[in-house]
From Swiss-Prot:
It is a multi-pass membrane protein. The keyword Cell membrane applies. GO terms for molecular function: gap junction channel activity; identical protein binding. Residues 46-75, 154-191 are extracellular. This is Gap junction beta-1 protein. Residues 1-22, 96-130, 215-283 are cytoplasmic. One gap junction consists of a cluster of closely packed pairs of transmembrane channels, the connexons, through which materials of low MW diffuse from one cell to a neighboring cell. It comes from Rattus norvegicus (Rat).
Length: 283
């Protein structure tokens, strides 16, 4: 399996993540994906061919293997890593949408040169507002996926230990047969390692949610004690709802003032223009 594309996407999200989120990404790609690609796939590469039962009955080996190993460990871990990494793409799409809006605002303000647009693409987006909710939801989904997969793994393989010998009575085996698992010690070591890495990721996800909530509460308390100035600058200020509403009100007041000046200079224009002016004022 090629993990390069997934790594490229998550690396873009990593630029806008918290410090805990960057540690989580390192654990994902160093301690889980690298181990899965380099070592685990080779250890489980011959699991079906090396699963031997002491019988010559056709089909007995395959049936017993499917009974004791319904899902391969490697495929289960691969599916887990893909689903755990998918919520981070929500943050990537949200950041891309926010940067698109910033570029549109710059073009409307007359700053649509390539230098300013490239600066929007390079600068780090702060986790606040709707992006904060998107980021928290993505972390919560990561946490849920990790917990669900650990529970499913426990249901499939209780005890997390790879046994050396299993006894199979499934049809078409003629009687109870002994089946031998290849490399049980190596598989047990890698299983414990991958589950420990998954547990570390769960702890990091919980810590990141707590960190985001504490930082949001601290930011809100700071805003209450020190109200922000209306003359703020920067891309984030241009995108704030207060700034947009102030700009709209300013444009409406300028249009209303211009219309009243025209009426004062031209008193004979009639009641039609005055009525239009009153309607604009009511708006």
């Amino acid at each position: 399996m090629n993990w390069t594309g997934l790594y490229t996407l998550l690396s873009g999200v990593n630029r806008h993540s918290t410090a805990i989120g960057r540690v989580w990404l390192s654990v994902i790609f160093i301690f889980r994906i690298m181990v899965l690609v380099v070592a685990a796939e080779s250890v489980w590469g011959d699991e079906k061919s090396s699963f031997i039962c002491n019988t010559l009955q056709p089909g007995c080996n395959s049936v017993c293997y499917d009974h004791f190993f319904p899902i391969s460990h490697v495929r289960l871990w691969s599916l887990q890593l893909i689903l755990v990494s998918t919520p981070a793409l929500l943050v990537a799409m949200h950041v891309a949408h926010q940067q698109h809006i910033e570029k549109k605002m710059l073009r409307l303000e007359g700053h649509g040169d390539p230098l300013h647009l490239e600066e929007v693409k390079r600068h780090k987006v702060h986790i606040s507002g709707t992006l904060w909710w998107t980021y928290v939801i993505s972390v919560v989904f990561r946490l849920l996926f990790e917990a669900v997969f650990m529970y499913v793994f426990y249901l499939l393989y209780p005890g997390y230990a790879m046994v050396r010998l299993v006894k199979c009575e499934a049809f078409p085996c003629p009687n109870t047969v002994d089946c031998f698992v290849s490399r049980p010690t190596e598989k047990t070591v890698f299983t414990v390692f991958m589950l420990a890495a998954s547990g570390i990721c769960i702890i990091l996800n919980v810590a990141e949610v707590v960190y985001l909530i504490i930082r949001a509460c601290a930011r809100r308390a700071q805003r209450r004690s020190n109200p922000p100035s209306r003359k703020g600058s920067g891309f984030g200020h241009r995108l704030s709802p207060e700034y947009k509403q102030n700009e709209i009100n300013k444009l409406l007041s300028e249009q209303d003032g211009s219309l009243k000046d025209i009426l004062r200079r031209s008193p004979g224009t009639g009641a039609g223009l005055a009525e239009k002016s009153d309607r604009c004022s009511a708006c």
